[in-house]
Amino acid sequence: IGIVEEEGRLPLKRGPKALQQNGMPFYHLTKKGLIVALAIDSISERRRILKGIVNEANDDEKQAFEIMAKLVKIAPHFAFSVFERYVKAYCENKLNDIVPFTVENVSKSADNSAQLQMELLEGFSKLSKSDRDQTIDFLKKID
């Protein structure tokens, strides 16, 4: 599925003769692999990975990755949950491929939770300042 690619081989001085002659392979993540990495909670370098992807993105993907980078700054749990849903949608065959990572493809991966979050965001933005503060206090208490 193209998540990793062989990057090269390191020669061995000891071990099986075949490995001494051919070397031990080492690998790197492809763009698909990096997107999958963004969906895994236990990876601590997700922000750095996203920054690297944004810098390398082509014109088709640049907008979606830049928006995601902004969301990671203000709402990291939400933003990384978008990557989780995106990879899950690919695993469930709702997407043909992980790349290109475009707004259109991300919208295909949206589920009920995305609609709930959008409804909350739109409603919250319409509240007065005092109502927003009360709502934030309430949500902090139930979190």
What are these regions (language model features)?
Residues 18-54:
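Short, amphipathic alpha-helical interaction segments positioned at domain boundaries
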Residues 1-14:
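A short, conserved structural fragment
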Residues 43-143:
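Exposed, interaction-prone assembly regions rather than primary DNA-binding/catalytic cores
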Residues 14-18, 60:
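Charge-rich, acidic-biased intrinsically disordered regions
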